[in-house]
């Protein structure tokens, strides 16, 4: 649950030269996410790479939370190994959504704080600016020139749920940039997000996903001795022969899935 008041106080503290339009932009991004849909991912990737090459180093945290389900990721993240391609794809996957009611609530908090003197802006000016913006249908707004000169913002938005994955993605991109073949095993308890993470990686890297469910033990393998072994509930021999060895040798992978209903291997 967001705390708009705390967010705005933190924002003006982190960016003391921010103007009213910069707070408008932060709240807009908090509610609506990416301002534009990405029609051409390759063009977005090239633009990110070019912008990052000329960007001023960012003094604060690379990942900056907003007041909602989005974060700003500053382009310094590319110096930590993340590729422009991966960042562009994360940006594209974080498509704009319309949370109009939540946005209006955030604006009401902003205007109330200005009225109470909690934010360093003129109350009448704030009311007029909000009214004019609302009458125009709340189009995307830009950072003020003062903000640009002071902070040289260079970032992209992404869903906040992707932010904890950035260290992993930086590591993967670093390996791939070196031309290293990479096989990633994802482990965790039931409901921990393994399938969700695997699906995201498949979207980001156009890579195959091999599910452990396809390698459950066949009935004849289910013995007390087998279940007493670490990882004994997995047909690791078949996983090794049909998937891991071909991957290691750079060969095509063709494997049989285990059917949990018939308890047999599919052809």
At which residue positions do the language-model features occur?
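Long, basic/Gly/Ser/Thr-rich N-terminal segments
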Residues: 1-147
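Conserved nucleotide-sensing/catalytic segment adjacent to the nucleotide-binding pocket
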Residues: 208-211, 216-266
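Conserved lysine of the Walker
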Residues: 194
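N-terminal pre-Walker A segment at the start of P-loop NTPase domains
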Residues: 151-176
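Hydrophobic positions on the alpha1 helix immediately C-terminal to the Walker A/P-loop
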Residues: 197
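Short hydrophobic/aromatic beta-strand immediately N-terminal to the Walker A/P-loop
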Residues: 183-185
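P-loop (Walker A) phosphate-binding loop of NTP-binding proteins
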Residues: 189
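Active-site signature of alpha/beta-hydrolase-fold catalytic machinery across serine-
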Residues: 200, 204
């Amino acid at each position: 649950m967001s705390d708009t008041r705390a967010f705005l106080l933190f924002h003006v503290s982190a960016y003391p030269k921010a103007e009213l339009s910069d707070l408008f932009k932060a709240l807009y991004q908090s509610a609506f996410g990416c301002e534009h849909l990405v029609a051409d991912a390759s063009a977005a990737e090239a633009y990110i790479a070019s912008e990052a090459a000329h960007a001023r180093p960012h003094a604060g945290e690379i990942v900056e939370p907003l007041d909602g389900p989005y974060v700003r990721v500053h382009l310094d993240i590319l110096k930590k190994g993340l590729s422009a391609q991966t960042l562009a794809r994360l940006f594209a996957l974080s498509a704009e959504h319309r949370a109009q009611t939540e946005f209006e609530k955030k604006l009401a908090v902003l205007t109330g704080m200005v009225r109470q003197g909690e934010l360093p802006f003129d109350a009448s000016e704030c009311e007029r600016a909000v009214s004019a913006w609302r009458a125009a249908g709340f189009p995307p707004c830009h950072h003020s020139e003062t903000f640009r000169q002071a902070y040289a913002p260079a970032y992209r938005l992404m869903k906040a749920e992707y932010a904890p994955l950035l260290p992993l993605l930086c590591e993967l991109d670093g390996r791939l940039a070196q031309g290293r073949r990479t096989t990633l095993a994802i482990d965790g308890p039931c409901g921990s997000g393994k399938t969700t993470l695997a699906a995201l990686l498949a979207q980001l890297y156009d890579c195959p996903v091999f599910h452990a469910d396809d390698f459950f033990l066949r009935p004849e393998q289910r013995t007390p001795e087998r279940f007493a072994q670490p990882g004994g509930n997995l047909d690791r021999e078949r996983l090794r022969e049909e998937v891991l060895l071909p991957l290691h040798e750079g060969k095509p992978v063709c494997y049989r899935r285990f059917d949990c209903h018939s308890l047999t291997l599919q052809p």
